[in-house]
Amino acid sequence: RFKKIRRLGALPGLTSKRPRSGSDLKNQLRSGKRSQYRIRLEEKQKLRFHYGLTERQLLKYVHIAGKAKGSTGRVLLQLLEMRLDNILFRLGMASTIPGARQLVNHRHILVNGHIVDILSYRSKPRDIITTKDNQRSKALIQNYLAWSPHEELPNHLTMDPFQYKGLVNQIIDSKWIGLKINELLVVEYYSRQT
């Protein structure tokens, strides 16, 4: 993980650690001139590692985004941001996306009153995300909520920390994306691969 954040910069979904300021200078001095291919590859890797996707999963999302109306890059980011594991991370119910994945895999999360154990579940507006009604599930979420830095919630989400309940209000707006990335470079990377 630390090699990845040193090479690619801060990835809040992967870890809360940040690269040291001195390591950035060393990377720039060592790397020399960066080719266009390398720049596109690094942007793609940033996206992949932040959301914890395999190459194949990311390629599938790029194809879905390409078929949808609108800007492919913007639709791609919306698809990734509306995944259940990412929604839990953005609500503060988990400190990282891998932590959110564990909550989903161990069946601690309910969506609209039903247990969902599919990480890639695509959240929709008016989805209500809660924990199971047992002590262990609530203790896990309470622990994450107590220790997570209280950042401003994106406007497409609402959180009630006392009832351990989150609400998806709408599809995410592009200015609330949690990662500094040029999505057009990712789309370019994949368009040149085919």
From Swiss-Prot:
GO biological process: ribosomal small subunit biogenesis; translation
CDD domains assigned to the protein according to its UniProt record, in alphabetical order: S4
PROSITE patterns for this protein: RIBOSOMAL_S4, S4
Domain of life (superkingdom): Eukaryota
Domain S4 RNA-binding: 82-143
Presence of keyword Metal-binding: no
One Pfam match: Ribosomal_S4
UniProt-annotated location(s): Plastid, Chloroplast
Keywords, in A-Z order: Chloroplast, Plastid, Ribonucleoprotein, Ribosomal protein, RNA-binding, rRNA-binding
GO CC terms in record: chloroplast; small ribosomal subunit
Subunit relationships: Part of the 30S ribosomal subunit. Contacts protein S5. The interaction surface between S4 and S5 is involved in control of translational fidelity.
Stated role: One of the primary rRNA binding proteins, it binds directly to 16S rRNA where it nucleates assembly of the body of the 30S subunit. With S5 and S12 plays an important role in translational accuracy.
Family statement drawn from the similarity comment of this UniProt entry: Belongs to the universal ribosomal protein uS4 family.
NCBIfam families for the chain: PRK05327.1, rpsD_bact
UniProt name for this protein: Small ribosomal subunit protein uS4c
Species this chain originates from: Iris ensata
